[in-house]
From Swiss-Prot:
The encoding gene: ade
GO BP annotations listed: adenine catabolic process
Name of the protein described by the UniProt record: Adenine deaminase
Swiss-Prot/TrEMBL catalytic activity: adenine + H2O + H(+) = hypoxanthine + NH4(+)
Molecular function GO terms recorded: adenine deaminase activity
EC top class named in words: hydrolase
PANTHER family registered for this protein in UniProt: ADENINE DEAMINASE, N-ACETYLGLUCOSAMINE-6-PHOSPHATE DEACETYLASE
Keywords: Hydrolase, Manganese
Length: 576
């Protein structure tokens, strides 16, 4: 919603009480994140903006009867693709939770579809009752250690910059490239020096962090320890406190937020699955968890609205004050925050957890075709010939994206290393879905818990090849074939039985179905994985990050097993 001469003149008049305002929320308890106070006021709205509070005549009135009103929430870092929902369906799920805007990183769809994927997001999110801002992906592909569906260089990003909702550069995951001065990395950093550049530097500190910040990188959402957060705050970064579907760092990082640092802290979800979005909520659940851990309510609400708006220079957002966007929710209680009524630009868009608008499939924008070029499914490709030495194994850890490097003697059968269910060791494989006739990369993983069958997904950060873990080679081939035939998605099953599949026709990442339907199908898959023995809260999300070679310690891409600490491939067997 843009300002022009006429609108500004009318709002100036309305703010002075010289014009009847569109809406007045009478007797509301305004959570003022600018002053830290909570005041009972009559809040006046005109043409989608706050006119002020005081004595106003209004065309329409709502008696809040003491309900609390706070600014709409802003998620400062989210991958919409992680919700498995198209933009319109994500909007329908998030807006009733009080979310007014997101700053999204489309590097998932960009890794699959390149610029056409970013353009699809821009077009599909246009005109929705939630503001989608985007940071352009900095790392497509994320690293040279994997194969993606596209490669984006600085000139490619430059071509998109005129779009008003493209506001910065998304997480610079290639921190070794920053520290080593890789030319393509430097070109991207220079292109965005006048804008915000998001970081991604887990466990980086000392002189390396000095160099990373000196390059103009302004935030990080990868802090997992209090010491890490404090060092990054001390060196000028905004710390985005992540509380998402897989990584939950709120409890560990909350002590870093104090009187001096809170303006440079904000809450983000990063990755959240549809079942969590439907069952728990979005930014509102992070706010409520922060309050339950002892954070003052006004501050918790500030970190979900004001501070992300200030960090990203989203003018007139993140607070309710004269001239600010009239995006807000109303709750009968301050703690917990329960958004019973949600307003966007002064219009009620959700009530009692339901969107009041029928978005259908959004604005009708069609997604580009999804690549699925897995043409080779051979049992011999999964065989790991036995070698001298111990086996390097990826260790999954509940509640974090960090994995452990485990070294154990392999189980050998007929001259080959195989899955060892007694020790919770499964075979792991990554199939390249962009180049036909490629054999998979194969490794082993501990911690997924399956006792039979296999689970697979084309949501495999960040290049989104097909990743699968299974108790046997036959199970792996059976489930991979089902995903391939669906055109991309998630699946669970075993040899000799029907495979459950959640089809994701949009880039192999997202569904065009409503959140309720997607969450139901996902829960069926999770139930299938749990019935097969997995004890993880979200085995599919855990699986989806095992191919991401920018988060320590050990990962598997289509090019092989990767030691993240050295940013290089390693053999499956350790001989020394």
């Amino acid at each position: 919603m843009k300002w022009d001469t006429g609108r500004m003149a009318r709002i100036i008049e309305a703010a002075q009480g010289k014009r009847v305002v569109d809406l007045c929320i009478r007797r509301c308890r305004l959570v003022n994140v600018l002053s830290g106070s909570i005041d009972t006021v009559d809040l006046a709205i005109h043409e989608g903006f706050v006119a002020g509070w005081g004595s106003y005549r209004a065309a329409r009135e709502i008696d809040a009867d003491g309900m609390y009103v706070c600014p709409g929430f802003i998620d400062g870092h989210i991958h919409i693709e992680s919700t498995l929902l198209a933009p319109a369906q994500f909007c329908a799920a998030a807006v009733p939770q009080g979310t007014a805007a997101v700053v999204a990183d489309p590097h998932e769809i960009a890794n699959v579809l390149g610029l056409s994927g970013i353009r699809y997001f821009l077009e599909a999110s246009e005109g929705l009752p939630l503001d989608f801002f985007f940071n352009l992906p900095s790392c497509v592909p994320a690293t040279p250690l994997e194969t993606s569906g596209a490669a984006l260089r600085a000139p490619d990003l430059d071509a998109l910059l005129p779009h008003e909702r493209l506001i910065g550069l998304a997480e610079m995951m290639n921190f070794p490239g920053v520290l080593s001065g890789f030319p393509d990395v430097i070109d991207k950093l220079l292109l965005f020096q006048a804008r915000r550049i998001d970081g991604h530097a887990p466990q980086l500190g000392d002189l390396g962090l000095n160099a990373y910040v000196a390059a103009g990188i302004t935030s990080d959402h990868e802090c997992t320890t209090l010491e890490e957060a404090r060092e990054k705050l001390a060196k000028g970064m905004t710390v985005m406190i992540r509380e998402g579907g897989q990584s939950r760092d709120l409890a560990a990082l909350l002590p870093a937020v104090d009187e001096h640092t809170w303006p440079r802290c904000c809450f983000v979800s990063d990755d959240v699955h549809p079942d969590g979005l439907l069952r728990e909520g979005h930014m509102n659940v992070i706010v409520n968890r922060a309050m339950s851990l002892g954070m003052a309510p006004v501050r918790a609400l500030s970190l979900a609205a004001l501070t992300p708006a200030r960090h990203f220079r989203l003018d007139r957002r993140g607070a309710l004050a004269p001239g600010y966007h009239a995006d807000f929710s109303m709750s009968p209680t301050l703690n917990p925050w329960q958004p019973e009524r949600v307003f966007k630009a002064g219009v009620e868009v959700a009530r009692d957890g339901r969107l009041l608008l029928d978005l259908g499939n959004g604005n009708g924008v069609a997604a580009p075709p999804s690549p699925m070029h897995i043409t080779r499914l051979l049992a011999e490709d999964l065989v790991v010939p036995a070698q001298p030495g111990l086996l390097r194994i990826i260790g999954v850890r509940e509640g974090t994206l960090l994995t452990r490097k485990i070294v154990l003697p392999p189980k050998i059968h007929e001259g080959a290393a195989v899955a060892d269910l007694d020790r919770d060791i499964l075979k792991l494989a990554v199939y390249n879905r962009y180049v036909p006739d490629r054999p998979p990369a194969v490794a082993f993983v501990q911690g997924l818990g399956l006792k039979e069958g296999a689970i697979a997904t084309t949501v495999a950060h960040d290049s989104h090849n097909l990743i699968v873990a299974g108790a046997s080679d036959a199970d792996i081939l059976h489930v991979v074939d089902a995903v391939r035939k669906s055109g991309g998605g998630m699946a669970a099953g075993r040899t000799g039985a029907e495979v459950d599949v959640l089809a994701l026709p949009i880039a192999g990442l997202m569904s065009d179905q409503p959140v309720e339907r997607v969450a139901e199908r996902l829960e069926q898959l999770q139930g299938r994985a749990r019935a097969a023995g997995s004890g993880l809260r979200n085995p599919f999300m855990a699986l989806s990050f095992l191919a991401l070679p920018v988060i320590p310690e050990l990962k598997l891409t289509d090019l092989g097993l990767i030691d993240v600490s050295t940013f290089s491939p390693v053999s499956l067997f350790e001989t020394s």
